[in-house]
Amino acid sequence: MRVVRADARGACERRLASALGFVLLACGCATESPPQPPPTTPHAFEYGSALPRASWPTQDWYRGFGSDELDEFVGLAVRDNTDLTVARERVAEADARARQAGAAILPKVSIDGNATYLSGHSNQGSGHELDWFAMLSASYEVDFWGKNRATANAARLGAGASRAERDTVALTLLGGVAGEYFQVLALRERLSIAHANRDATKKILEAVQARFDAGVASPTELASQKAAWYAAQIVISDLEQLEMEARATLALLLGRPPENFEVRAENLDSLREPLVAAGLPSELLTRRPDVVMAETSLRAAHANLAAARAAMFPNLTLTAAAGVQNPALPAIVNTIPGVGPSYSAIAGLTQPIFDHGRLAAQRDEALAKEQELLATYRAAIIASLVDVEKALSTVQHLDAVREFQQGNVAESERAFEGAQLRYQRGSGDFLTLLESQRTLYAARDQFAQYRLARLEALVTLCKALGGGWNASAAATRDAEIAPAARAHDAASS
């Protein structure tokens, strides 16, 4: 093996260090101007002033309904829902793409080497030789025009958009879980009302049957009451089917099979109504993950446009390398004095001349994509404002009719009790009794649906206001709701 002199090796290392240093110092960068600003937002929501003063919803807004079971279901959904799992994996993919794009900004360093062992025999004897070679190289594309940095920035922003999309899926999921949970409880409450109506119908039927047997009631009255009893049975059957479907939908949102999936609560009585109101419309732009996703996607498209424009300019690549070898053919190598360390430094310049308009088409495509996402961003902002206004209007409307709903039930109960008493005494007619019973059932059932609508409106408002979302809310929420999911699993096992 050949021995390399220390002074030659030192000179080689100094030259290699100088070349590598030049590569590292040649890192260029470029900044992109921000995309066009969003449309002007109103100073206040039209229906916001009608609500009591309150703050924006927090990220655990669902806890405001006061249901431990709902908290457990939310934890299960965030952990096990398949759509949210897919969204999380898309974030991981986007992060990996961002790391790949970011690597192009930095110099590439590689090492290459090989070794060959030769052995042979002849009349003079046998011998063997070891030939080895090692080289360290570094290359860097000087980013004069900012193409690599713009590409990396676009990938980074794309990862941010994926996070906002994941959080949009999570917010939609939480709203869906709460809504379906309330639907199950409301249907059970309506079932309870339907059972009570059937029981009342049966009692009236027995009274009509007795009067018919006594020759007081007519066959028409008896047939009408029997029809009312059958109708009450049909309503119960229909509501039971709807309750089963709602439970199955809720199980799907939780990532659970519908078999043996149970909901403990039986009605809406244990739920509270959280106080929710909107802040300034301008704040909504940073509180809705779908709006943030649209904005981040727009910025990513702007960075892609900058990269497409930069691709039309020359590329300058710097390469430096140094290597050491041990010759396997001494007879040849010995004829070349000073064989040992070697080094090189190369600068390459590439300029597209004629590519049939490919680069220009890529630039035009990126420009059109930016304009498309700008329109999407504006549409997302307008849609978010409309969502809030509609939700606020619905809540305000339901607040206004609460007294009417309660009064309708109270007066219907009073009317039915009076009609029933008069009929039993023989001073009232059957049609009045039958109509008052139908009115009472309709009023109670309508009030149960009103309570559901009120809860669903609050869920919609929380979603429209962003559900307490901010840039770091998702990670915090996941950490806080995990114990509830584990508690549910422990209770179920």
Task: Tell where the protein language model's regions lie, with residue ranges.
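Terminal intrinsically disordered/low-complexity segments used for targeting and assembly
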Residues: 2-4, 12, 16-79, 132, ...
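Periplasmic alpha-helical coiled-coil/stalk elements that build and connect Gram-negative outer-membrane
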Residues: 148, 164-280, 394, 398, ...
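C-terminal structured "cap/appendage" subdomains that terminate the fold
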Residues: 415-455
